[in-house]
Swiss-Prot record:
GO terms for biological process: maturation of SSU-rRNA from tricistronic rRNA transcript (SSU-rRNA, 5.8S rRNA, LSU-rRNA); translation. This is Small ribosomal subunit protein uS9. Keywords: Cytoplasm, Ribonucleoprotein, Ribosomal protein. One of its GO terms (molecular function) is structural constituent of ribosome. Its main location: cytoplasm. GO terms for cellular component: cytosolic small ribosomal subunit. It is found in: Cytoplasm. The gene is RPS16.
Amino acid sequence: MAAVESVQCFGRKKTAVAVTYCRRGRGLIRLTVPIELVEPEILRYKAFEPVLLLGRSKFAGVDMRIRVKGGGNTSQIYAIRQSIAKALVAYFQKYVDEQSKKEIKDVLLRYDRTLLVADPRRCEPKKFGGRGARSRFQKSYR
C-alpha cells in the first residue's frame, strides 16, 4: 500500500489553535467552522489571504482539512491563515521541490511575516492593588 503524501501544521494566535492536515488532492479546503458564517466579511478574506496571494494554481493539487479551537473570532481567523500558509510551505518542501517552496515562502514573507511566524504576545496577568495588569486603585492622602 502506498504512503499518503501528507503534512500536518498548526497556526496560533493568542489562545486560538488551528491545525491543518494537508495532502494530495483536488484543491478542496474544508473548515470545521462554516466560513460563510464569519462576520464581518473582511475576516473571510483574511482567512484565505494565502490562497489569494499565491493563486489557485498552487492549491490545485492539494486538499486541506482545518480544525480550529479556542480564542475569539478574529484570533481563530488569524490562526487559520497561518496554518494554511505553513502547511502549504511544508507540503512543497517535503513532496515537491525546494525552488517552488522558496518562491512561496518569499511571497508570503514579503506580504506579511505573521503568515509564517507566530505572534508571541500574550495577555499580561492581573496583579493586586488595581483593577487590571497595570492600572492601580486611586490613592487618597486624607
